[in-house]
Design a protein with these regions (language model features):
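Outer-membrane beta-barrel initiation region
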Residues: 1-51, 123-147, 238, 243, ...
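Transmembrane beta-strands of outer-membrane beta-barrel pores
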Residues: 2-4, 19, 30-36, 52-54, ...
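Outer-envelope beta-barrel architecture signal
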Residues: 7-11, 22-26, 51-57, 78-80, ...
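Feature captures outer-membrane beta-barrel proteins of Gram-negative bacteria and organelles
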Residues: 11-19, 40-60, 77-90, 127-137, ...
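Extended hydrophobic-aromatic, low-complexity segments
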Residues: 24-28, 257-264, 284-287, 308-312
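Outer-membrane beta-barrel translocator/channel fold
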Residues: 51-121, 189-234, 318-334
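C-terminal outer-membrane beta-barrel translocator/porin domains of Gram-negative envelope proteins
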Residues: 72, 119-275, 283-285, 326, ...
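Conserved, short, structured surface segments that act as functional micro-motifs
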Residues: 315
Length: 339
């Protein structure tokens, strides 16, 4: 198999091991990037992941990722990483669900922040712990292709320790969906706010924003523009702040459902358009450093089925970014979700 590491392509092998009931699974990946543009200690890659009931763990060395080949979002990172986490479901009364998630991670010999691909570090060793509550109670009517009403929220606390300093962060999100009189169409208000305690010039004491977040070929969520740390119309990690408030208004338009477009081996299922506008304030607690950003844009998602079994989604998006009242840039996004 092929693996992406930073801007290079390597060769590797992946194996999955599972029990017959699917309670436990282990994934093992090994790869090598044959290029003279990387130091010798970055050409080898290894990763082991494991899951058992609510537990999950991972260990990696120079982590590589297949979808990094396509970009622009990169998951590959230099150095060692050891992670362990646990998900505990407190409420499971569908559609209501409340989860409590714990995560602990240790990094060594790193050169980039684990959660910000374009932010270099001044340290090589990092310990992080995170705990969060995640609640969802969203609903959709018969024939809908997306959630149409309800609420969801999250509250997360995180601590990062490097070079003898402990930097705490806390953030939360709140989403409210209101149906419109138009069938299968809703207005969503998506809010987020957070803050960190640390020096503004400390990379760990900042939140980073930018980009749609989708790769040209991907396996992740389709509508990543909804995530609080994305900001279509800007480069990935281009915007930062030690505290922030973000407000998005999204209008999900009625989907177009295809009844007989295609052939048995490949046919179109539906087309879902959406429009959005976002306002982001950073460093809101400091009047001298306070900045405001915004965007307007849209995304259309075309779902199609291959061989009656594989559902894929082709997404196209466009956004214009603003800093204050001035136009700051534009961004086109095209992404094919294959898994």
């Amino acid at each position: 198999m092929l693996q992406g590491y930073k801007n290079y392509i390597g060769l590797g092998y992946h194996a999955n091991i599972e029990d017959s009931l699917g309670f436990a699974r282990i994934g093992i990946t090994g790869a090598y990037t044959p290029t003279g543009n990387l130091p010798g200690n970055q050409q080898g890659h290894a990763e082991i992941t494991g899951e058992y009931l609510g537990w999950r763990a991972a260990f990696s060395y120079n982590r590589s990722d297949f979808y990094d080949i396509f970009g622009p979002t990169k998951k590959s990172r230099k150095g060692y990483a050891a992670k362990v986490g646990y998900d505990n479901t407190i409420i499971w009364d569908e559609p209501r669900q409340l989860d409590l998630k714990f995560d602990l991670a240790y990094y060594d010999k790193i050169d980039t922040l684990p959660n910000a691909q374009n932010v270099e570090t001044t340290f090589t060793r990092l310990v992080q712990g995170q705990v969060g509550l995640h609640y969802t109670d969203v609903r959709r009517s018969i024939g809908a292709v997306d959630d149409e009403k309800g609420i969801s929220w999250s509250l997360v606390a995180k601590g990062s320790q490097a070079q003898g300093q402990l930097i705490p962060q806390i953030w939360g999100t709140f989403n409210l969906g209101i149906p419109t009189p138009i069938p299968h169409s809703s207005i969503w208000l998506r809010s987020a706010a957070g803050g960190a305690n640390g020096e503004r010039n400390n990379s760990l004491a900042n939140f980073y924003f930018g980009g749609f977040g989708n790769n040209y070929v991907d396996d992740g969520p389709i509508q990543r523009y909804r995530d609080f740390n994305t900001l279509p119309g800007f480069e990935i990690d281009e915007v930062s702040g030690s505290n922030f408030f973000r407000q998005m208004v999204e209008w999900t338009l009625p989907p177009i459902v295809f009844e007989s477009v295609g052939m048995p081996s490949i046919h179109l299922t539906w087309l879902r358009p959406a429009l959005f506008a976002t306002k982001l304030w950073t460093d809101v607690a400091n009047s001298e450093r306070r900045q405001n950003y915004g965007n307007v844009g849209g995304q259309a998602d075309l779902r199609f089925s291959v061989l009656h079994w594989y559902d894929m989604t082709l997404s196209v998006g466009y956004a214009v970014g603003f800093q204050g009242t001035k136009r700051a840039g534009t961004e086109w996004m095209i992404s094919l979700k294959i898994m």
